[in-house]
Amino acid sequence: MFALKKNEGFDRLLKMIGEQNEKNVDRSEEIEKILNSLKLTMKAWKTDTGIYSIIKYDKTALGLTQDDYASIGLLRSVVVDESGKIVSYSPPKSLNITAERETQFNLNNIMSPIGDDNTNEWDAEEFVEGTMINLFYSEKGNSWEVATKSTVGGNVTFFSPKNPKDTVEIREKDTFRNMFFETCKKVGVNYEEFPKEFMYSFVLQHPKNRIVLPITEEKIYITGLYTINQDTLEVNQLNRAGFIKNYCANAVLTPKPLFSVDYTVAGFKKEFASMNSPYNLMGVVFNNMITGERMKVRNPNYELVKNAKGTENKMMLQYLSLRHGGRVAEYLKSFPEYKTDYSVYRNSVHAFTKNLHQNYLDCFVFKKKPFAEFPQQYKKYMIQLNKKYIEELRENRNCVTFNYVMEFVNKIEPGALLFSLNYVVREHKTVIQRLEEPIEKVIDTATDTVEVKATTEETATATATDEPTPIEKEKEKEKEKQE
């Protein structure tokens, strides 16, 4: 249950909105004062079903802290009608995973494949890519209405058309509103049968609204289902599975549940949100089934592809070149406006270094899986590290430590390092290009790729097998003692 009155003055704000609209009393000054004090924004929208206001927390507000999100984060996207009544509610903002919250995760209180909703406090599910569409019933308009996070009516598009001449046509045909209702019809969702007192939050996937993933078919996921007590302003979260079973089985999807080997946050991150995770995993979302709290971890590879731009490569190469020469701090003294961007690039290099070291250990020391199964962008350097171990470190009984890998990465030529850091971006572009190619061309290209990949991995595997196992190392030490 979400207590919206936790935001002191929010109930008064709703009352002021109602008085201004229905009694024609000017409350704009008082409304603005409450919005500012609560760090909220509000925008009015007029549709065929009525006049609405979307209230959201202001991400740009001065002095906004993570602690504030526990209260104003409940107001991520709230739609109010002209009487001040809440008609639509979206899932609240996800909270940061703090050290205290991280201790809550273990096999005893997070859903496992054999877990029970009644005995586990948390569950983990895939972070679904798409556009949030909230559905609610308008009593005044006597029909169903939709809202996105920032608009009511959904008569907007996300991507601008490449051809300006197509603007009007595309806005009319490919709005979020049209795509949502067309998808409902295609997958067999009869929303006219839905309970009108519920507020619904969905994620829409549509081929015409591609964000990162190569979406080829329309899908609708339900992420939130709510009722509200208009007097107490308490929002109740309802069971999604039960709703689907009764009203839209085989039509509306729920995010896929995720399971980890050790059921810790670190375990989930490693499997679903690390530099080793494929870019087509957006991340993982943790849901508290008692309080309704949400926490999420984003996959850095997904974010890398999402934020990739033409000018981004030039800036990143510039950073890597300065870093290679030890001149980053000096450069930022003259151009401090690049500090934020450079921090992002630095974190990418650090994550790459950490994963390269772990992949080396998992492959050549712990033998967790075959060399061929490791991410392509690390293989070249894993082989080089193994070679250095054999030729330089083994004789002195030294091993490949994290500091050794850090120094190794610092010496990689900037262009080569950029190539590896951007591997998932190029992989994504290839997938998208193939979606748009004729099928005959895709088959020919795929055949050539398989042949080249097979040859490359055979060579790489042959090199990799030169690395001794831990048992072989112990035998070697015993042999040296005997001599």
Each model region followed by its residue ranges:
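Core nucleotide-handling region used for phosphoryl-transfer chemistry
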Residues: M1-E483
